[in-house]
């Protein structure tokens, strides 16, 4: 079946007729679903001309009290009774077929690419070779991307082939488009949504910031197909999210907690999901979401296509993979060993807690010599985040804070101010900053060191993205001594100069591989009191973000 043909021709020629029969035969009326999909749920759903518009609104989740919650249980799946669906759309381009095995291996070696599994498709080298339908290819070209990234070159053929797959690559390497574009092709091959239908594509993400960014990409590239999406996350009113689900969306991007809430209160279901994405799986597990992930995935038909994306490959992710992926193929860009990008200059200063504030200001003066610079500062706690921001603002630095105690509209506003450069200094906690993809961050400053080396690598990875250069400054105190050995190892691997003051912590921590240790006490901001914690009802700016600005430094 060609996916480059006009929609009208495809549908008027009944190329999807088999789907109509499958769904009209009451496949969803079996005990698995309690008869909620009656015999004619999809009757005539494929008739007529599609004309480029995905009609067939979902909706109608009624029949349950607003406050009624039903605990999710694992369905007993009978695959023979489920309607069949298409998931292999890959047709290898002649230029790709013509490449010899030695040429393929040379390409993979050049891009530090390793593949594991059976019958792995060859990588592509250009957008035209990917085999996308014209309506997807045109969207990509309109965005002006010069060529696919390494993960896209191998990830697209894998995803389009319908195989379960694992993609491991650094944050900022183009993973989102690696699953977003194939999902559009997948959706357009499925029957239209009917009343009461949930999404066809489900993307799980660890944080609301990352979920929103994924939604922006899906909206951008799904526009020509009129594919609808929604973003389901906590910390925001449920009303609009519920209305989106009731109207029907083909793509749902969600954080695990809020999605379970929507499922247990009957606001949506996962019966139609045939394309599942777990994005930043390592961070979701680090944040304790494994029980929620398992509960959600158990609600999805087991013959779905599952795509797992991660920046690292810890044992916990491997276990999840064995439990939920079927004969997966895997692509890794770079080393499986934890490593920092070689395009980032790492500077570590060993000092006392009382020296940190002065050193922070000195580094800000250096960073902002470039008037276009964006600086991301990490603190260990929400309180410290607010106190650093208040101090910087009083000293004339245009800083704003983002952390979990800020309301969602304020977090969105802070992120916009930072992205546009109106407030080029952002102070954040780890959870708030995870997944934030802001172009042009030139400096990352670890005012407080993280508790483990994985978080250090994730933090400094906010700069030096997509081949650009960046600088990461870390203020290291005696309280961080247990992190010393791993920090020295990361710096050496990236060919960075390890300061002599740090080497004594390397000897003290020799052989350590701290994964979840807290790295000793973190130290505090220095007894600054509790001011600046109010939420502020009069507008976006709460607490530290509403602190008065001194004479602006730059």
Swiss-Prot record:
Instruction: Give UniProt keywords alphabetically.
Output: ATP-binding, Cytoplasm, Helicase, Hydrolase, Nonsense-mediated mRNA decay, Nucleotide-binding, Nucleus, Ribosome biogenesis, RNA-binding, rRNA processing
One Pfam family of this chain: Helicase_C
Give binding positions for ATP. 169-176
Q: Which residues form the signal peptide?
A: none
Motif segment (DEAD box): 279-282
InterPro entries, A to Z: DEAD/DEAH_box_helicase_dom, Helicase_ATP-bd, Helicase_C-like, P-loop_NTPase, RNA-helicase_DEAD-box_CS, RNA_helicase_DEAD_Q_motif
Name the chemical reaction catalysed here. ATP + H2O = ADP + phosphate + H(+)
Give the EC number(s) listed in the UniProt record: 3.6.4.13
Domain remarks in the entry? The Q motif is unique to and characteristic of the DEAD box family of RNA helicases and controls ATP binding and hydrolysis.
Complex formation: Associates with polysomes.
Free-text function comment from the UniProt entry: ATP-dependent RNA helicase involved nonsense-mediated mRNA decay and ribosome biogenesis through rRNA processing.
Q: Which family, according to the similarity comment?
A: Belongs to the DEAD box helicase family. DDX5/DBP2 subfamily.
**Name used for this protein in its record:** ATP-dependent RNA helicase DBP2
Instruction: Quote the gene name from the UniProt entry.
Output: DBP2
């Amino acid at each position: 079946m060609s996916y480059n043909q006009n929609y009208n021709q495809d549908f008027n020629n009944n190329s999807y007729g088999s789907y109509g029969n499958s769904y009209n035969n009451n496949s969803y009326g079996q005990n698995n679903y309690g008869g909620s999909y009656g015999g004619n749920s999809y009757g005539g759903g494929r008739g007529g001309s599609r004309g480029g518009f995905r009609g067939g609104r979902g909706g109608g989740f009624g029949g349950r009290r607003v406050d009624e919650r039903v605990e999710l249980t694992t369905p007993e799946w009978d695959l023979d009774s489920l309607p069949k669906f298409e998931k292999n759309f890959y047709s290898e381009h002649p230029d790709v077929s013509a490449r010899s095995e030695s040429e393929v291996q040379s390409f993979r070696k050049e891009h530090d690419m390793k593949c594991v599994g059976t019958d792995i498709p060859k990588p592509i080298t250009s957008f035209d070779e990917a085999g996308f339908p014209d309506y997807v290819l045109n969207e990509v070209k309109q965005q002006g991307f010069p060529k696919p990234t390494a993960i896209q070159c191998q990830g697209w053929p894998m995803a389009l082939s319908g195989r379960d797959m694992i993609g491991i690559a650094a944050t900022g390497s183009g993973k989102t488009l690696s699953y977003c574009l194939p999902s559009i092709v997948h959706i357009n091959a499925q029957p239209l949504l009917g009343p009461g239908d949930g999404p066809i594509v489900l993307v799980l993400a660890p944080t609301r910031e990352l979920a929103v960014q994924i939604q922006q990409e899906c909206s951008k590239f799904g526009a020509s197909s009129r594919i609808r999406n929604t973003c389901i996350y906590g910390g925001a009113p449920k009303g609009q999210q519920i209305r989106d689900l009731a109207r029907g969306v083909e793509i749902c991007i969600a954080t695990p907690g809020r999605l379970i809430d929507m499922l247990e209160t009957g606001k949506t279901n996962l019966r139609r999901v045939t394309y599942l994405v777990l994005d930043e799986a390592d961070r979701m597990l680090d944040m304790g979401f494994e029980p929620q992930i398992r509960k959600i995935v158990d609600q999805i038909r087991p013959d779905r296509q599952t795509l797992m994306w991660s920046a690292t490959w810890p044992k916990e992710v491997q276990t999840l993979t064995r439990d939920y992926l079927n004969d997966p193929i895997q692509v890794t860009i770079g080393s499986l060993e934890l490593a920092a990008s070689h395009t980032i200059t790492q500077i570590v200063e060993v000092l006392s807690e009382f020296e940190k504030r002065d050193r922070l200001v000195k580094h800000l003066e250096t960073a902002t010599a470039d008037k276009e610079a964006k600086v991301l500062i990490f603190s260990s706690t929400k309180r410290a985040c607010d106190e650093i921001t208040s101090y910087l603002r009083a000293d004339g630095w245009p800083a704003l804070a983002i952390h979990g105690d800020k309301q969602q509209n304020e977090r969105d506003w802070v992120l916009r101010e930072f992205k546009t450069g109106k407030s080029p200094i952002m102070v954040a906690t780890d959870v708030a900053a995870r997944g934030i993809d802001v172009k042009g961050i030139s400096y990352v400053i670890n005012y407080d060191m993280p508790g483990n080396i994985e978080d250090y690598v994730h933090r400094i990875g906010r700069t030096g993205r997509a081949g650009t250069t960046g600088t990461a400054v870390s203020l290291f105190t005696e309280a961080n001594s247990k992190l010393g050995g791993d920090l020295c190892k990361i710096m050496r691997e990236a060919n960075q100069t390890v300061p002599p003051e740090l080497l004594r912590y390397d000897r003290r921590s020799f052989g350590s591989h701290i994964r979840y240790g807290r790295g000793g006490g973190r130290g505090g901001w220095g007894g600054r009191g509790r001011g600046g914690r109010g939420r502020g009802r009069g507008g976006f700016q709460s607490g530290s973000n509403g602190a008065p600005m001194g004479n602006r430094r730059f």
